[in-house]
Amino acid sequence: MAKIVSGDDVIVITGSDKGKVGKVVKILRKGGRVLAKVASVALCRKSVKPSKNREGGIFSIERFIDISNVAFFDSEAGVRTRVGYKFVDGKKVRYLKSSGRVLD
């Protein structure tokens, strides 16, 4: 069970996008690394040649950032927080350490 999963609100804690809040679009676990693709954060521009199906041009795309550079963002309290695990009715669930609110 991962601490940050798709659909979570996260805040970027390091890098040029520090302080930006976004929603995790996709998690990629490959080669022992975990990368998070966050909506509207870490944008880069890509030049695409025209083809039969698509026009060419310069597009902004989201790139993956390392999961160590993001933290869970509690949208109710408006602060970043850590995520922990506990057992509720024999089921392992994620909870916010700052408020104790159960996520799953």
Swiss-Prot record:
Single GO MF descriptor: structural constituent of ribosome
Record NCBIfam families: rplX_bact (TIGR01079)
Higher taxonomy: Bacteria, Pseudomonadati, Pseudomonadota, Alphaproteobacteria, Rickettsiales
Pfam family, one: ribosomal_L24
GO cellular component, one term: ribonucleoprotein complex
The family this protein is said to belong to: Belongs to the universal ribosomal protein uL24 family.
SUPFAM superfamilies, sorted: Translation proteins SH3-like domain (SSF50104)
GO biological process, alphabetically ordered: translation
Protein name: Large ribosomal subunit protein uL24
Protein purpose: One of two assembly initiator proteins, it binds directly to the 5'-end of the 23S rRNA, where it nucleates assembly of the 50S subunit.
Keywords, comma-separated and alphabetical: Ribonucleoprotein, Ribosomal protein, RNA-binding, rRNA-binding
CDD domains (UniProt xref): KOW_RPL26
